[in-house]
Regions:
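Short, well-formed alpha-helical segments that are part of the catalytic scaffolds
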Residues: 16-29
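Short aromatic/hydrophobic "clamp" motif used to bind/position activated sugar donors
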Residues: 90
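A conserved acidic beta->alpha catalytic loop
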Residues: 26, 41-53, 97-98
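Conserved donor NDP-sugar-binding/catalytic core segment of glycosyltransferases
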Residues: 102-131
Length: 238
């Protein structure tokens, strides 16, 4: 499958030199990745990440078509990246999402097309096995939440471009869980989470602590209709 005419990938990034390098290296191994537009929306100020990204671009190191744009908080960064999207689907990925299975993209894009869905996601697991029990608990909570409305996290969000335009993109007033705020606007029968796995370093659990992350997730669920709750960044990005 030639993905270049089907999907564009948008990745917010800030001060994640080694991580974004690994993410992009793994993207090079995806089946059908040749020519796919990959837009990294970077707001790094560490003096290293920007150089790494521009070196990749200058020396044409990737099979995909790399673009670099200004970033910001995830909602703004993703909306910026979307300005270059011309394909029928767009994949919003976090900078620390590792696609270890080389057929993840072709499989998921094929399914969203065949099933005519507006938004799909996949299962998350840690790249070293730590905290996987937390991800499994989240899987259960996500299934329960989906009885009422879609619940999607922004680590891996593949959405129909026309639907993204219809919704108006990510709400830039929202500082946390902008991905969840977007997914709530999708009809239940147009959303699905596939039993395909992608991997991520459990750095937020290590940096913020399990209790903080648990409170944030439960708080998001309990305040799903309270936009003011999500306007406060709650020190997540500090």
């Amino acid at each position: 499958m030639d993905l270049s005419n089907l999907v564009t990938i948008v990745i917010p990034c800030k001060n994640e030199n080694d991580i974004i390098s690994k993410t992009l290296d793994l993207l090079n191994h995806q089946t059908g990745i040749s020519g796919v537009k990959v837009i990294v929306c970077d707001s790094s100020d560490d003096g290293i990440t920007k150089l790494t990204l521009w070196d990749r671009l200058e020396y044409n190191m990737d099979y995909f078509d790399l673009h670099i744009m200004d970033g910001g908080l995830p909602a703004r960064a993703r909306n910026n990246g979307f300005k270059l999207v011309t394909t029928p689907y767009v994949l919003f990925m976090d900078a620390d999402i590792f696609l270890l299975d080389s057929d993840v993209l072709t499989n998921v894009v094929s399914k969203i097309k065949t099933e005519d869905l507006d938004l799909v996601s996949v299962r998350l697991r840690s790249d070293n096995g730590d905290y996987n029990y937390v991800y499994k608990v989240f899987d259960v909570l996500q299934r329960l939440s989906m009885l009422v409305s879609p619940f999607c996290l922004g680590g891996f969000m593949l959405t129909k471009t026309s639907k993204f335009k219809e919704i108006g993109g990510f709400d830039e007033e929202v500082k946390i869980a902008e991905d969840y705020a977007y997914s709530k606007q999708i009809k239940r029968d147009k959303f699905k989470v596939y039993n395909t796995f992608v991997y991520t370093p459990p750095r937020r659990f290590k940096d913020k602590g399990l209790w903080y992350m648990t409170k944030l997730m439960i708080g998001s669920l309990l305040n799903k209709n309270n936009k003011e709750y999500f306007k406060d960044g709650k020190d997540y990005w500090s």
